[in-house]
Amino acid sequence: MTTHVVLYSGGLDSTIVLDMVRRTLARMGDEVVPVYFDLRQPYSEAEIRRLDPSIQIDDRISWLGEADETSPIPIVSLRNIFMVLLCATMGNKVYFGQLHPLSESTSDGDQLFLSLMSLLLQKVASDPRHGLAYPEVFTPLSEYSKPQAVRRYLASGGRPEALLSSFSCFQPLDDTPCGECNACVNRYVALKLNSLPPGTEYIVNPESTQYYDFEFKRQATTL
């Protein structure tokens, strides 16, 4: 039996990856384990409140520290490394929702990162005393932009309702997304380019923000 471990945040990308693993990648008898890592960020409580009971919550790396608030996309340094390593102790196939570099350019999610992490894990697994079953790391969305990933998900029979209930916001007010941050705008644009409503109320209309026009034009070129 193969255990598929999915890094899950509740956003569009991880929602699509989890559905992809459950419907097309996992075989009969395989186990699929979605894991949410609580990094104790300002948005973490809002994300956790929306999680389905089937999602496993893990707080073992909550000590990593605060994100860089000066960046448009708050980044917790080294989080992907630690999350992948921990996931590899739970199963032998690990997935996370990294997009094409056109959409998200990052040094801890590209193909070189994946290759190095897989090599490291397989080196450790070569010693049977560690009890690891040759873990592999996958990013099934790495060839697609966010709107492309949404379009492929819908074309494959994915439920629009799952996308509309997704949540991505760095500065929510209680459970209401701000509408102004990069995460809100990217989610809004990806749904709009696929003729879907946002599925939520925003504090600020994303179309009135400084990011909207740029992101809409940039993401539209990928379709």
Question: Can you annotate each of these PLM segments?
Answer:
Residues 2-6, 58-64, 71-75, 133, ...:
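ATP/NTP-dependent adenylation/nucleotidyl-transfer catalytic domains that generate, transfer
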